[in-house]
Amino acid sequence: MSFQQRFARALDVGYKNFLSKDAVRNIFAYDNHLRGLVQKECKIHQTPYRVPSDLMVQSASDPARANLFNYSSQLVNHDFFFSGLISPERPSADADLGAINLKPGIDASFGSFGELKSQMVDVGNSVFGDGWLWLVYSPEKSLFSLLCTYNASNAFLWGTGFPKFRTNAIVPLLCVNLWQYAYLDDYGLNGKKMYITKWWDMINWTVVNNRFQATRIESL
């Protein structure tokens, strides 16, 4: 499902108490702008246009294509962030069901879901500058942990997301956008902490659990 298809409803109504429709439209416009920049960079470097994840991997270790990496990586981050939210038309209770399966691992890693929330809010709020905060899982250690990446970088290139960089170190399960454009419209310059707190209430734990279960299947 494309970014446009997934968020057609959100463009009209926003994300409940998390993001207004105006904020969603601004993020959507920025996403489209990035797609235009990706196409431009592909022409400059005579690179066949592919999905952002492929372009990100291809350009990650090439300084001459740093712009292509940044633009495509940010698109990957956008998609992962929004796909982890409860859709506007879906009851929140349905999206909480996945938390049941995650609870034993979360409790072992953080103490409780409440402590995970507290750490994500505090760590995310303390990030200086633009970036992303990730919940990741280590199949080797059977532990969940937090990871901060800055600017357009992401957790996929640290872990199992793409074969070229496969290390089995970590698997991204969830992320929150910490760039100012994500929260400035609705929360203001000093509203990042409230933005992250509201985001927590919009997490689709069923999606997160599906990502987690996929790592367990791969390890068999």
UniProtKB/Swiss-Prot annotation:
SUPFAM superfamilies in UniProt: Fe,Mn superoxide dismutase (SOD), C-terminal domain, Fe,Mn superoxide dismutase (SOD), N-terminal domain
Keyword annotations: Mitochondrion, Ribonucleoprotein, Ribosomal protein
GO terms for biological process, alphabetical: mitochondrial translation; removal of superoxide radicals
UniProt GO cellular component terms: cytoplasm; cytosol; mitochondrial small ribosomal subunit; nucleus
Domain of life of the organism encoding this protein: Eukaryota
Subcellular location field: Mitochondrion
Gene Ontology MF terms: metal ion binding; structural constituent of ribosome; superoxide dismutase activity
InterPro entries, sorted: Mn/Fe_SOD_C, Mn/Fe_SOD_N_sf, SOD_C_sf
Homology family: Belongs to the mitochondrion-specific ribosomal protein mS42 family.
Function: Component of the mitochondrial ribosome (mitoribosome), a dedicated translation machinery responsible for the synthesis of mitochondrial genome-encoded proteins, including at least some of the essential transmembrane subunits of the mitochondrial respiratory chain. The mitoribosomes are attached to the mitochondrial inner membrane and translation products are cotranslationally integrated into the membrane.
Assembly description: Component of the mitochondrial small ribosomal subunit (mt-SSU). Mature yeast 74S mitochondrial ribosomes consist of a small (37S) and a large (54S) subunit. The 37S small subunit contains a 15S ribosomal RNA (15S mt-rRNA) and at least 32 different proteins. The 54S large subunit contains a 21S rRNA (21S mt-rRNA) and at least 45 different proteins. mS43 forms a dimer with mS42, building a large protuberance adjacent to the mRNA channel exit in the mt-SSU body.
UniProt name for this protein: Small ribosomal subunit protein mS42
